[in-house]
Amino acid sequence: MKTIKITQIKSSIGRIPDHKKTLLGLGLRHIGHSVIRQDTPSIRGMIKKISYILKIQEE
C-alpha cells in the first residue's frame, strides 16, 4: 500500500478545537513535525479537513 509523508507547516494555536484533535489524530505535535502514514480513505479525509496546516508528499 502507498504511503504519505505529512508535515505540519503552521501552528495549531488559535485553530478550531476539532482541527487540533485531527492534528493529534495524525500524530503531529508541532511545526516541522513529519509522520508517514498509509494512504487510506480515513487518513485522506483527515488531511482534507486540515489541508491548510499541512504539506503532503506522496511516497
From Swiss-Prot:
Gene Ontology cellular component list: cytosolic large ribosomal subunit
GO molecular function: structural constituent of ribosome
Keyword field contains DNA damage: no
CDD domains registered for this protein in UniProt: Ribosomal_L30
Pfam families named among the record's database cross-references: Ribosomal_L30
Keywords in alphabetical order: Ribonucleoprotein, Ribosomal protein
GO biological process: translation
Keyword Lipid biosynthesis: no
Domain of life: Bacteria
Transmembrane segments: none
NCBIfam families cross-referenced by the UniProt entry: rpmD_bact (TIGR01308)
Family membership noted in the UniProt record: Belongs to the universal ribosomal protein uL30 family.
HAMAP family: Ribosomal_uL30_B
Oligomer status and interactors: Part of the 50S ribosomal subunit.
Protein name (Swiss-Prot/TrEMBL): Large ribosomal subunit protein uL30
Source organism per UniProt: Buchnera aphidicola subsp. Schizaphis graminum (strain Sg)
